[in-house]
Each structure stands twice: as structure tokens, then as C-alpha cells.
């Protein structure tokens, strides 16, 4: 089992145990990031029925993966709750947004989604990356700080996610009392990587989520909070073997990876291999 082979003492965030490889939620939720292949999201949704999602959760647990990252506003969170009622143990790291940015409607209070995540039993909750960036652009770090303080008050782990290094850097500089950061990291060694005119923190064509990987690695070396790296395969454009190795070598403490059920066993093996051969200078922060 993944967690047993590598031990658990170094895999804890504030006493809560997490596997080094975590299950991303985009594939089961249909967020394909498939560039101009518009049918892929529909294919994902048709494949990942409630039964298939449950099978995926069960297989992940058997392989030693003990956490999944899901939004609280999508129906897949309800599937996870049913899985728990049947005895499932996989932990939820929940994505949430404040009321003024909430997707799906129906949010009255600023922090309704964060309260919902805590109430449903999330092990950790983080501000979703696009929310972080919108609040940063609007110069509303006070809202981010209020989110962090609220989740902390509920005795739940809290984090901040970002695609933009500048947004994350400002959160770190503000010394927010987070338990972890979640930051994108991937190389540009794939065909649809950013072109020279794509200088923003996101690719213009739903094709990039980390425009400055070297700078990210250098900055995260200075951050003493646990780092969950996501989009390490650039939404499926980079094979898992080099993607996992690059992430762990670059200092990530955990890797969040979207996986279909039939990919999980192989991806766990690739993660084992990456950790066995890891060469990193950033200390393990969890």
C-alpha cells in the first residue's frame, strides 16, 4: 500500500495523515481542460456515472490513496457522502468560494460554501484558485484572511490555492495562517504549451496553468508550509512518470492528480518510483 511503503510520519498536515499522491476531482466532475476538443468533457461526464465514481473511490482507497479534491458545489460531493455512508474512508479536501464569487448560485452568506464543506466532514478546505486570483486582483486579501480565520475556527485544515504565482506570493507575504498552499506546477514540455505571446498566468487556450515553473520552484523553496502541487500533468498533456518526478524533485510535498479508475494502479506505481528516486533540495514540509 502506498502509505505503508513510504511511512506516514512525514505525510501529515497538522496531525492529519494524507497520502503523497491524492486524487484530483476534475475528471470525475467533467472539467476536461481539453483545449479545442470540445467533446471530451461530455465523454468524461458520460463515463463517470455515480457507479463509476464510487468504483474509482474504492480503487483509490485499495491502492493507498486517502484523499480526493472536490468542489462543494458539484454533485460529485454528494456521491462522496454516499460512499462514506457505505464505509468509505477517503478524505475530502474541499474547494470552496466566497458568496460573491460562488458558482451554482444559492449562496446567501460570504462563507456558506466553506461552512457546507466543514459540515459535510471535509478534512481540509481551501479557497479555489480562481477565487484567490479574483480576490487578489480586486485587492481583497482581507476576504481571504477572513476565510482562513473562519475555517480555522471550525477546527478544520485550511489552505489557499492558486494558478498565479503573484497571487500566491502576496498571500505568503501577508503571512496568512494557512495550513497548506496548493499551487500549480508543470513544465512546458508538451505540444500545446504556451506560445511566446501567452504571458498571463493561464494559457489563452485552456492550455497552461503554470507559466513560470522555474520561478515557482524557486519561490516555493522559501515557503515553510506544506505544498500540494496540482496540474502537474498539464491536464493530461504530460505523462505521469515525468510529471510526478518533476513535482517531487521540485519540492512538492503532495501531488494532486486527476485519474480515471483504470489509471490509478499504474499512477500509484509511478508515484512510488518517483518518491524512491527523489532528488530535491526543498525540505519536506509534511
Regions found by a protein language model. Give the residues of each.
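Acidic (Asp/Glu)-rich catalytic clusters
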Residues: 58-62, 79-89, 111-121, 172-175, ...
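Catalytic alpha/beta core domains of metabolic enzymes, predominantly
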Residues: 159-246, 250, 255-263, 282
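Glycine/proline-rich, positively charged
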Residues: 98-179, 222-223, 233
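Active-site-adjacent beta->alpha loops and helix N-cap segments on the catalytic face
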Residues: 72-89, 104-110, 131-148, 165-169, ...
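Structural preference for beta-strand elements that scaffold enzyme active sites
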Residues: 18-22, 66-67, 89-93, 123-126, ...
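Alpha-helix-loop-beta-strand connector modules within alpha/beta enzyme cores
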Residues: 46-55, 76-100, 141-157, 207-225, ...
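C-terminal helical cap(s) of enzyme catalytic domains, especially alpha/beta-barrels
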Residues: 262-286
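N-terminal binding-site loop/beta-alpha segment at the start of enzyme catalytic domains
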Residues: 2-87, 243-246, 285-286
Amino acid at each position: 500500500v502506498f502509505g505503508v511503503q513510504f511511512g506516514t510520519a512525514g505525510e501529515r498536515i497538522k496531525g492529519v495523515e494524507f497520502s503523497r499522491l491524492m486524487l484530483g476531482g476534475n475528471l470525475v466532475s467533467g472539467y476536461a481542460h481539453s483545449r479545442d476538443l470540445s467533446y471530451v468533457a461530455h465523454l468524461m461526464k458520460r463515463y463517470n456515472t455515480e457507479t463509476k465514481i464510487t468504483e474509482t473511490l474504492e480503487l483509490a482507497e485499495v491502492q493507498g490513496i486517502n484523499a480526493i479534491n472536490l468542489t462543494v458545489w458539484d454533485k460529485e460531493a454528494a456521491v462522496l457522502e454516499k460512499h462514506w455512508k457505505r464505509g468509505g474512508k477517503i478524505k475530502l479536501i474541499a474547494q470552496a468560494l466566497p458568496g460573491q464569487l460562488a458558482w451554482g448560485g444559492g449562496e446567501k452568506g460570504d462563507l456558506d460554501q466553506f461552512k457546507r464543506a466543514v459540515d459535510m466532514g471535509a478534512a481540509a478546505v481551501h479557497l479555489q484558485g480562481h477565487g484567490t486570483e479574483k480576490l487578489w486582483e480586486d485587492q481583497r486579501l482581507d476576504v481571504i484572511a477572513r476565510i482562513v480565520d473562519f475555517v480555522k475556527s471550525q477546527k478544520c485544515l485550511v489552505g489557499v490555492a492558486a494558478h498565479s504565482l503573484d497571487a500566491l506570493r502576496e498571500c505568503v507575504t501577508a503571512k496568512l495562517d494557512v495550513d497548506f498552499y496548493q499551487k500549480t506546477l508543470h513544465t512546458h514540455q508538451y505540444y500545446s504549451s504556451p506560445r511566446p505571446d501567452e504571458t498571463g498566468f493561464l494559457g489563452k487556450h485552456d492550455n497552461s496553468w503554470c507559466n513560470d515553473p522555474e520561478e515557482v520552484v524557486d519561490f516555493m523553496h522559501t515557503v515553510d508550509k506544506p505544498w500540494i502541487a496540482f496540474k502537474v500533468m498539464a491536464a493530461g498533456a504530460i505523462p505521469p512518470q515525468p510529471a510526478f518526478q518533476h513535482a517531487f524533485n521540485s519540492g512538492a510535498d503532495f501531488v494532486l492528480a486527476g485519474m480515471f479508475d483504470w489509471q490509478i494502479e499504474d499512477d500509484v506505481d509511478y508515484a512510488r518510483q518517483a518518491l524512491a528516486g527523489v532528488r530535491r533540495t526543498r525540505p519536506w514540509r509534511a
